[in-house]
Amino acid sequence: MKKINATTPLPYTFEPERMNAKYSMNDGKTWMNHGEFCERMAKAILGYAPTKDAVAFDMGYDLPELKASIKSRKCGLTERHDMPKTPAEFMANFWEREHAELYIYAIDHGDEFNLYMMNRTEFRQFVEHFAKWDAHCVKFRINVCDTKTERWLEDRLGE
């Protein structure tokens, strides 16, 4: 795992009161969720562009879709009828479909931005550590608060 600390290179506004918390690029038009924002930041900071081999991801909302990172590659579970009935079924299906080699998770500290780059094994450990099955809405969610997530990631930087 690798960490890059950088100043946020793009002008944006965070509006947590919007559904699922949205970011705007301050043009009044471009709204995005956290994962899409992570992708833009990663591209601006690293010169990174999403490919089948590298992906920025958002774990704050619905893991079945990993919407921000995987929707364009059609690797995630995106249809309601495709939803698994058990956590084990979901995980087996997810890992069968997800084949990227580099995963980027971003934590925003206002003007500072930490990018955590993980390989497939580290990403899998991250997902399995924070995943929570919500039987009421038949969804996997990542039970994440940035402080807890960052502490977990920081602990693994030295490994």
Model region roles, listed by residue range:
Residues M1-E159:
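Nucleic-acid endonuclease domains
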